[in-house]
Structures are given as C-alpha cells and as structure tokens.
A protein has these predicted regions:
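Intrinsically disordered, low-complexity serine/threonine- and proline-rich regulatory segments
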Residues: 1-7, 91-94
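Amphipathic alpha-helical dimerization/coiled-coil segments
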Residues: 82-105
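Beta-hairpin "wing" of winged helix-turn-helix
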Residues: 56-69, 75
C-alpha cells in the first residue's frame, strides 16, 4: 500500500502514471501525454523530468532496464497503480457530483 496521504495528484503526475502502463523513455512519455490529451498538454522536458524524479522518490515509478543504455525508461509500480486508481475514483466522484448538482441556466 502507498504510504502517502490521499491528496489529489497533479495533472502532470496523473498523465505520467497513466502513460507508464508499459515502460517508456522521457520523449515517448511526452508524446504519449500529448496524444492522450489531444494536444491540450504539451509537456516540457524540465516539467517531465522534475515530475519523474518526484514520482520515483515516492516509489510510484521505477527506472527499468532497456536495450539502449543511453535512454532511461520508466514504468509504474504497484504503489503507483494504487494511487492512480484512487485518483481515478476521486475524479469519477467529482464528475458525478457535477452532473448531479451543476445546473445550467
């Protein structure tokens, strides 16, 4: 079980974890996020690598071996999957609340 609080993930962390269901290197993560969000999010390298370091420190992702030693690949851990599942549930609850209580004039 993750040893963190249940605070919301940042949008950056959410999309990185969502992207890392299979091992990917940094540039592929950026491209995947751009694709998932239909171009709405175009993440810069500084943002990506800062977030990767933070997620790695929390043990939500790990660096994995890859064929090309000049590239670092990352993959989500079981703790990362649990955190992602909780975030998806939180977002679903928010959407349900909006659909129930938001009234357009």
């Amino acid at each position: 079980m993750p040893t963190t609080n249940t605070s919301a993930l940042t949008e950056t962390a959410y999309y990185i974890l969502l992207s890392l269901q299979t091992p990917l290197h940094g540039y592929a993560i950026m491209q995947n996020i751009k694709s998932i969000t239909n171009g709405r999010i175009s993440m810069g390298a500084g943002t990506l690598y800062g977030a990767l370091n933070a997620l790695n420190e929390k043990k939500y992702i790990v660096e994995c071996e890859c064929d090309d030693p000049s590239r670092r690949e990352y993959v989500i851990t079981n703790d990362g999957k649990e955190v992602l599942k909780k975030e998806i549930s939180r977002l679903e609850e928010m959407l349900q609340n909006a659909q129930t209580y938001f009234k357009e004039d």
